[in-house]
């Protein structure tokens, strides 16, 4: 397990991390979310000693992270850090050597990951002559070449086409099933919702919400509800609901259906009774809020 405990980091008058704490269970795929400037990249850099916190600790498997443990980490930074004049396979193998592999093992692993990531035939291509998407695949191979126990990816899906997104998502799931722990940041919340079991949301340098996504959605303060009647009930037939049903807000509708957001405290049976008093109800769909809605609520509050 990765444990980030009470990290504090100041840059002059700017408080980048304000007691940030987050746990990443072993073998889990965790999305680290937050608006721009929330502190996501700073957290990731502290894991690798690129940023030294003013306070707080980082532990891996119960021990403070040091140079030796970092050799078992893989990192894909937001600012891609490739050597443009090096050939793809040569570059990946070079980082494999830095990760502790022998020359032969590093070269073999480089070829294997290039094949796996759709870069077969480009082993001898200079990095600066590859497309943006293929450069990103080389950067991912650099992070994976030494088979790390912890994989940290800063905006790995940025700039990828839909097919490449699907390939990377499937790979991350496969890695986690094999026991790799993965922490990644992304602004693509729909993708994170489909991909992750766990999320942590940062704002102003601290974690404002974290946990199992299914539990966060089930326990959210507001939920979505759509009600459809069997006949047209006229314009704005739902207007009285805001008075009769405290905690119910109308998001929109027409003569036959209405979309609502309801507080967690609202008794849904009362909503159904109110709808049936208007006309026959043919649809009564309840959905927990999306990750995007949870994110906005957490950051606003």
What annotation goes with each model-predicted range?
Residues 2-4, 9-203, 209:
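ABC transporter nucleotide-binding domains
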Residues 263-301:
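C-terminal coupling/interaction segments
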Residues 5, 228, 285-287:
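Solvent-exposed beta-strand sheet faces enriched in polar/charged residues
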Residues 69, 220, 295-298:
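Short, flexible helix/strand-to-coil boundary loops that buttress conserved ligand/catalytic motifs
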Residues 48, 80, 245-246, 279:
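Structural motif
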Residues 169-262:
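ABC transporter nucleotide-binding domain
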């Amino acid at each position: 397990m990765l444990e980030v405990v009470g990290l504090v980091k100041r840059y002059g008058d700017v408080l980048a991390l304000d007691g940030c704490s987050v746990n990443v269970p072993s073998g889990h795929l965790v999305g680290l979310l937050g608006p721009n400037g929330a502190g996501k990249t700073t957290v990731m850099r502290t894991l690798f000693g690129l940023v030294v916190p003013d306070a707080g600790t980082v532990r891996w498997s119960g021990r403070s992270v040091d140079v030796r443990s970092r050799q078992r980490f893989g990192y894909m930074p937001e600012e891609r850090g490739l050597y443009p004049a090096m050939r793809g396979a040569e570059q990946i193998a070079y980082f494999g050597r830095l990760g502790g592999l022998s020359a032969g093992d590093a070269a073999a692993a480089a070829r294997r990951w290039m094949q796996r990531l759709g870069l077969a035939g480009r082993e001898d291509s200079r990095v600066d002559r590859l497309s943006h998407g293929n450069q990103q695949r080389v950067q991912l191979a650099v992070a994976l070449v030494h088979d790390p126990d912890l994989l940290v990816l800063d905006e790995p899906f940025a700039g990828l086409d839909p097919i490449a997104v699907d390939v990377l998502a499937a790979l991350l799931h496969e890695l986690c099933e094999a026991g790799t722990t993965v922490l990644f940041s992304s602004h693509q919340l729909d993708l994170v919702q489909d991909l992750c079991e766990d999320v942590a949301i940062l704002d102003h340098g601290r974690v404002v919400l974290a946990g199992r996504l299914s539990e966060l959605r089930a326990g959210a303060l507001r939920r979505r509800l759509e009600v459809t009647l069997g006949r047209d009930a006229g314009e704005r037939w739902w207007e009285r609901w805001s008075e009769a049903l405290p905690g119910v807000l109308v998001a929109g509708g027409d003569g036959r259906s209405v979309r609502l957001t309801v507080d967690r405290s609202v008794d849904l049976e009362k909503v159904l009774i109110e709808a049936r008093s208007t006309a026959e109800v043919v649809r009564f769909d309840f959905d927990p809020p999306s990750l995007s809605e949870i994110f906005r609520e957490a950051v606003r509050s």
